[in-house]
């Protein structure tokens, strides 16, 4: 598998057919970012999603969620064209190449600059776009349509000598600078320009946020910033430690996860988007631009598995910060990028949603749920982290508080890893991860001679283990089930041996893996659903990509390497043209569903690839 993934092409006449002619498939995008925020760039040269100045800020481009009101910034040839898109090797710098019927070729290179040490290149987020014609003469069309605060605020766009100035009449400002002046036509706060590029010609465009001054484009040093940005990403990706046959996809997944980190706070977000639907036209549309402690912990474990440890150190600082504010060992399941607790969910009724999928939500109502598994994932990550870092008294005090909380509260019902918005229950995976929290706390306390009531923790751990084996197992299904005393299968039970609750060679592990493979997969056995029963929400959902990778890993670990690798390779073919995945896949069409790109999916890809490599004697 090479670093550059197979590419797709886009024909505008075909893309513009159907019920939603202005919205591309979710899979038709690449992601750029500077580890403060990110932007989705389509195969058609349009930036259709970008929030500034942070991942969880209001959007300035959101045509992904409403092509009329959301805003976008497109650059592409006039008339018919085809396009391909790729990342420059070992980077998060995106290149979209357009070909016209008369043999013209123009490439658009998009990036958000970072310094050579991975920090933002300055106080103001920037997007740099290089237009380069390598063949023929091509008439280009640019449309600049910013819309602040999810399109809810009035935007004013003005043409100045050095470029465009956009504001929302309050405190938000965008500037767009260009190497040569364009003849802008501005109507209804949308600026358009036609211009011609000929072979050998190159133009730079620079978008800058929150700077009242607009400068000639040369002042932004795009060439130097491109070199520095490429140098950082190439150096970072060169440290990915994986020698198996899927190196290209493992590197791409690691690079995608790195884009979802916040360099200032150490936070790791679940995805950079909100409200991309789990079913087209459905209501399961959620905001993922926050720090789920579970997802962050899984991300750090995956990055650790491929040799990147610094991210764990940064996240531990974030974790200590939120724990100091919480007190008593209690954790929310998610926090804002800066550690804020208040993530009130609201609906943006003025937006039509992706392909008519409403409501569009910002904030997340699941923030108040109890999800016991979070404690286990955090403690598992801490156990991994401490192998390469010194355990300070302050850090242990935080972790000790978490273990104490679990020892007192593991018996409570919760909402599960799947954030069920219905009745709380005794979910088996939640109980297993509570066991993990206790087990890792005991291990760290004993191995490092740290303070803690390990005797009480051990009693709680062993009691919980026995209870799970009794009430979490179904003799009728010959499988671990979703919650105590029911018969519902749940793909989350595939992860039980991954956290060493039971060894991989245990008969109940083998039987559970076989049951999931038999009953929770699509007809062809290629994709995996989370579960099959109603969960209290309207509508349906697609197959969950993390669950498919979990099944592949589990099959490999119980000895069915052939089937495991077949499922894994099929999942690799489901990646989009630049190697990215969303949360879910529509089994009928193969189209992406859910927020994109999704950390969970890339985490599971890395872990599965690493497991396959270990079984082959590689690392």
Write out the residue ranges for each language-model feature:
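Acidic, mature catalytic/reactive cores of soluble proteins
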Residues: 1-619
């Amino acid at each position: 598998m090479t670093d550059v993934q197979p590419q797709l092409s886009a024909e505008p006449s075909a893309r513009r057919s159907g019920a939603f002619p202005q919205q591309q498939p979710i899979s038709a995008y690449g992601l750029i970012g500077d580890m403060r925020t990110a932007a989705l760039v389509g195969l058609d040269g349009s930036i259709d999603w970008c929030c500034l100045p942070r991942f969880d800020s209001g959007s300035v481009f959101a045509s992904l969620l409403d092509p009329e009101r959301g805003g976008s910034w497109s650059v592409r040839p006039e008339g018919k064209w085809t396009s391909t898109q790729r990342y420059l090797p070992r980077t998060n710098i995106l290149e979209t190449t357009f070909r016209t019927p008369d043999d013209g070729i123009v490439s658009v290179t998009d990036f958000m600059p970072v310094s050579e040490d991975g920090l933002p290149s300055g106080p103001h987020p920037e997007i740099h776009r290089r237009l380069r014609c390598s063949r023929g003469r091509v008439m280009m069309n640019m449309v600049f349509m910013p819309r602040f605060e999810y399109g809810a605020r009035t935007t004013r766009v003005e043409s100045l000598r050095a470029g465009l100035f956009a504001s929302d009449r309050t405190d938000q400002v965008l500037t767009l600078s260009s190497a040569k002046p364009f003849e802008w036509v501005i109507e209804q706060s949308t600026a358009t320009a036609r211009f011609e590029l000929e072979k050998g010609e190159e133009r730079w465009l620079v978008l800058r946020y929150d700077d009242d001054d607009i400068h000639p484009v040369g002042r932004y040093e795009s060439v130097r910033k491109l070199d520095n940005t490429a140098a950082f990403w190439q150096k970072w990706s060169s440290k990915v430690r994986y020698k198996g046959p899927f190196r290209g996809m493992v590197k791409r997944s690691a690079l995608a996860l790195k884009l979802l980190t916040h360099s200032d706070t150490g936070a790791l977000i679940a995805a950079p988007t909100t409200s991309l639907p789990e079913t087209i036209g459905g209501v399961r549309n959620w905001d993922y631009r926050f720090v789920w402690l579970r997802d962050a912990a899984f991300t750090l474990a995956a990055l650790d598995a491929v040799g990147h440890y610094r991210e764990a150190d940064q996240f531990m600082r974030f974790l200590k910060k939120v724990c100091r504010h919480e007190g008593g060992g209690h954790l929310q399941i998610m926090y804002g990028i800066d550690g804020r607790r208040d993530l009130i969910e609201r609906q943006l009724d003025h937006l039509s949603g992706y392909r008519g999928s409403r409501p569009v939500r910002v904030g997340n109502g699941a923030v108040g749920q109890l999800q016991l598994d979070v404690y286990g994932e955090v403690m598992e990550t801490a156990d991994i982290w401490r192998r390469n870092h010194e355990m300070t008294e302050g850090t242990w005090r935080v972790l000790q508080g978490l273990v104490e909380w679990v020892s007192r509260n593991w018996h409570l019902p919760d909402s599960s890893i799947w954030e069920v918005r219905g009745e709380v229950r005794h979910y088996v995976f939640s109980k297993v991860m509570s066991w993990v929290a206790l087990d890792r706390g005991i291990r760290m306390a004993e191995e490092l001679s740290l303070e803690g009531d390990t005797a009480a923790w051990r009693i709680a751990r062993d009691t919980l283990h026995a209870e799970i084996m009794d009430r979490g197992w179904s003799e009728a299904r010959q499988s671990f089930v979703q919650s105590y005393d029911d018969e519902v299968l749940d793909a989350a039970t595939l992860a039980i041996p991954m956290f060493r609750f039971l060894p991989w060679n245990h008969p109940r592990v083998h039987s559970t893996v076989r049951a999931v493979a038999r009953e929770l997969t699509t007809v062809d056995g290629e994709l995996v659903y989370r579960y099959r029963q109603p969960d209290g929400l309207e509508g349906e959902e697609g197959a969950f990509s993390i669950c498919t990778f979990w099944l592949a890993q589990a099959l490999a670990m119980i000895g069915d390497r052939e089937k495991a690798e077949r499922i894994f390779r099929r999942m690799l073919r489901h990646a989009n043209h630049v190697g990215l995945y969303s949360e879910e896949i529509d089994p009928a069409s193969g189209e992406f569903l859910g927020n994109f790109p999704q950390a969970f999916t890339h985490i599971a890809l890395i872990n599965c690839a690493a497991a396959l490599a270990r079984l082959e004697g590689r690392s």
